[in-house]
């Protein structure tokens, strides 16, 4: 809700739609006109709808996605992609490609049920995607009146800077700050980070180091930092660490495990893919097997992301 509410304010303030076709941002790129089911959802997310039937036996459906230059992360699967190309993406019935660019900051909350959604949240869940600098300005108001037209609102700037180490900053709230809680609980998730970065985390509130809960989620490969602070304070989270790999072997296993294809073929594919061969050699061998085109395509998405 915080992200969506901020984007709705952007629509009001800047006359920009919440959903924008790709050619709005890239009017001179031919690919932007070819992906009719792909769009930007606000300024932090890119979405590709899946409108093709599920592939029988593979339990996934395909959609062609154009990735502009840069690094992109699927916020649901965690897969990291190199941009500047077209990619066939395969998804199960419960998922579609929703991508954040490197440097993206996605602000959400768990307070979305009943009357919770009527007030500004006391806790925020923030996802940060590494690989580039990025920023986001959170917007809040009284959620009831049109007083925002006269400036009755609050802005909270957030930014992520990456050089020798990553520094994520939540700046002090600005504006009519009585509209928001005086104190907030922040859960900041640094997505696609290697576990080694967990030991380097340092949290500062108004420049003073403070205690925070730090944990690592292995499957999702993210460092989670939990800290409480006044909304009038500056919060900085500093960490050093490498971007995690794409867990290729695990993803291939999960895909083959759920696919309804012969066990002998599953085993042959898995043994080949996990044999440690260089990628060009591996792709050549897979191509020579004359696999079903969608089975080959689904494996290519994982192997070449």
Which role does the model predict for each range below?
Residues 114-305:
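Beta-rich accessory regions
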């Amino acid at each position: 809700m915080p992200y969506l509410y901020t984007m709705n304010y952007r629509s009001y303030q800047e006359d920009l739609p919440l959903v924008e076709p790709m050619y709005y941002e890239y009017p001179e790129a031919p690919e932007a006109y070819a992906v009719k089911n792909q769009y930007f959802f606000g300024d932090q997310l890119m979405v590709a709808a899946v409108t093709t039937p599920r592939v029988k036996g593979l339990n996934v459906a395909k959609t062609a996605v154009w990735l502009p230059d840069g690094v992109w992360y699927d916020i649901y699967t965690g897969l990291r992609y190199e941009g500047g190309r077209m990619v066939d993406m395969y998804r199960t019935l419960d998922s579609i490609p929703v991508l954040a660019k490197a440097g993206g900051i996605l602000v959400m909350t768990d307070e979305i049920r009943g009357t919770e959604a009527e007030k500004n949240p006391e806790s925020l869940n923030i996802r940060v995607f590494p690989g580039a600098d990025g920023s986001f300005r959170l917007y809040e108001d009284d959620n009831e009146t049109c007083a925002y037209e006269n400036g009755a609102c609050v802005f909270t700037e957030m930014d992520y800077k990456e050089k020798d180490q990553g520094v994520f900053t939540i700046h002090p709230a600005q504006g009519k700050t009585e509209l928001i809680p005086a104190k907030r609980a922040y859960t900041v998730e640094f997505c696609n980070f290697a576990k080694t970065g967990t030991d380097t985390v340092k949290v500062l509130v108004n420049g003073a180091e403070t205690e925070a809960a730090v944990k690592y989620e292995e499957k999702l490969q993210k460092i989670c930092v939990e800290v409480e602070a006044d909304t009038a304070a500056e919060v900085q989270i500093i960490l050093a660490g490498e971007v995690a790999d794409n867990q290729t072997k695990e993803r291939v296993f999960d895909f083959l495990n759920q696919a309804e294809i012969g066990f002998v073929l599953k085993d042959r594919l898995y043994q080949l893919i996990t044999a440690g061969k260089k990628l060009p050699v591996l792709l050549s061998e897979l191509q020579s097997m004359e696999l079903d085109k969608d089975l080959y395509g689904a494996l290519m998405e994982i192997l070449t992301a």
